[in-house]
Regions:
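Flavin-dependent oxidoreductase catalytic cores
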Residues: 1-313
Length: 313
């Protein structure tokens, strides 16, 4: 089971926690190929990767083959790292530049980007795609998208694996994922296919693997506040039903501690607020604590609230 790239979330700490729970692979947040070329502030920070994270995919976004090639070459000597090219991001500011899911509209250029990366990287290059640009229900009946053809083209261009988010760009993250498309792509390719979309639990992951024939299953949003999902994948007996408030509090303390080491108290404090909300989602009587966490002004104050969460039931 694989941790998806999550903008603003899948930093080194989150990847480490996922790995400790059993994730076989994780991805960085999206890294701009142009940002690497122009040395944009903050871009290098996204490439902080610790060996304890296990194998990590650096997810590049960009639509210019020469920029993708530059970024891939820059990463070639990084150990335990593969290169992934984002062809699925639906966000308008990315799409308007011809990047992310807009690359589905120019398959030939997408293939050139893969070829450029594969030539320079000296390591596996993968692609994360969607199953089309238009279509509210995962299918555009009037103008069906040839997602199998696109995936095949990526394989021919040198992709070592293809991750498929089984939604269109128009769907963003809503509506039902079209697992049938994952099955069709899995049937057509000789390289591994990673299925993604509507994997909300370890049981969903097992079902996707069985129903689609994909090689690996990727989850993203389901891991927010629940890094244990990877442990449940490896061991069906590791059910969340047996997880106590104390277990959740302990994980939050570790998460916050690692964030402080990586980013310093202030940045860690701001970042941990959203994670506290995810960790305590569905926990009875947690609403007031969440409100207090969102106004916490120091690391010690936040730790006090995290410890208090251990007493909730």
């Amino acid at each position: 089971m694989v941790l998806a790239p999550l903008a603003g979330i899948s930093d080194s700490v989150f990847r480490r926690l996922a790995r400790e729970q059993g994730a076989s692979l994780s991805y960085t947040e999206m890294v701009s190929a142009k940002g690497l070329y122009y040395k944009s502030p903050g871009t290098e920070d996204l490439l902080r990767i610790d060996e304890c994270e296990g194998p990590v995919g650096v997810q590049l976004f960009g639509s210019e083959p020469d920029m993708i090639a530059f970024a891939a070459e820059k990463l070639k000597d990084r150990p335990n790292v593969l290169i992934d090219i984002n062809m699925g991001c639906p966000v308008p500011k990315v799409v308007k530049n011809g990047e992310g899911s807009a690359m589905l509209l120019d398959p030939d250029n997408a293939a050139r980007c893969v070829e450029a990366a594969a030539e320079k990287a000296g390591k596996p290059v993968t692609v994360k795609m969607r199953i089309g640009f238009e279509g509210k229900d995962g299918v555009d009946a009037d103008h069906p998208y040839d997602y199998v053809g696109f995936a095949r083209l990526m394989e021919r261009a040198g992709a070592s694996a293809v991750a498929v988010h089984a939604r269109t760009r128009q769907q963003y993250y809503s509506g039902k994922a079209n697992w049938k498309a994952v099955a069709e792509i899995s049937d057509a390719l000789s390289v591994p296919v990673i299925g993604n979309g509507d994997v909300k639990s370890a049981d969903d992951a097992r079902r996707m693997l069985s129903e689609t024939g994909c090689s690996l299953v990727m989850t993203g949003r389901a891991a927010l506040g629940d890094p244990w999902i990877f442990a449940e994948w490896k061991d069906p007996k590791a059910s969340k039903k047996h997880r106590s408030a104390a277990d959740i509090s302990k994980m939050m303390l570790r998460h916050f501690g690692l964030l402080r080491e990586l980013k310093g108290d202030r940045t860690a404090l701001m970042g941990m607020r959203k994670h506290f909300g995810w960790y305590t989602k569905g926990v009875r009587k947690a609403a007031e604590l969440r409100r207090q966490v969102n106004t916490a002004q120091s690391a010690d104050e936040l730790i006090e609230y995290i410890n208090a969460a251990a007493e909730l039931s």
